[in-house]
Structure formats: C-alpha cells, structure tokens
Amino acid sequence: MIIHKTADVNGMFKREYAFTLTKLGTAKEQMEKLDEALQCYTMAMQITKELLAASPDDGKLKWNMFASYEQIGHIAELKHNYREAELLYRQSLEICRTNVKLGTRPFDEDALASSLYRLGALPLQRKATDERKNALKKRCP
C-alpha cells in the first residue's frame, strides 16, 4: 500500500490516517457494517500502537489507544461477544485509570466514569440478551 511507504518523519501522516480510519469505522458502525467498522478500528489501533511505541509520553496517543479499546469493545458488545467486550473495556479502563492518576491530559474523572459505566453495563446487556434468547426458545419448540 502506497500510504505506508510515504516518509512520515514526525508521525503526523500516520496520526491523520489513524484518525481517518476511526472516523470511517464510526460511519461503518452507524451503517451497521460491524465487521468493516471493526477492521477500521483495528487498523487505527495498530497505527496508534506504533506511534505510541515511538512517543510513549504522548497524552493524545494514549487517549487514542483508550478510545480504540472502547470502540472495539463496543463492536464486540453489539455482536453479543460480551466476554471479549469485557476484556477490551477492562484494557481501556486500565489506560484511563492510570492516566487520570498521572494527570495526563485529556484524561479526567468523566472519562473514567464513562469507562466504568460501559464495563458495569455489560452484565445487564448479557442478561437482556439471554432473556430474549430464552423467550425465543419458548416460542419456537
């Protein structure tokens, strides 16, 4: 792919590419094309990991990594893969919790609360899905 062969001295091109992939993933998610959204989010996360390895103190990159785990976790949740969603949400929570303690911008208590909420809501989602499945089983012998 030509995109990866272009010189990118300060990582700005890769940052913009990851941002674009994230926006595309969001659009695909809104169109209910979850597999395509997942592919975009995963590619954006990989680029962010590479950039973060080169700049481990970059708060914006840390935020992007946090957001990537949240987005991929949300896709897993929408696909009823609750165990996978839980693992991804726990990873995002750990990134957020660590960076709130360190005072890394843009992490704050609101982001932490949101992350905790997503993780805490999963058992309710799982229960509702199980109840729907059981109701369908009773209707269709």
Each PLM stretch: what is its role?
Residues 1-16, 23-40, 46, 79, ...:
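Leucine-rich, hydrophobic repeat-scaffold detector
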Residues 2-6, 47-54, 95-103, 122, ...:
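Residue position in alpha-helical solenoids
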Residues 12, 16-19, 60-67, 107, ...:
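Residue register of alpha-helical TPR repeats
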Residues 10, 30, 58, 78, ...:
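Alpha-helical rod/repeat scaffolding segments in eukaryotic adaptors/tethers
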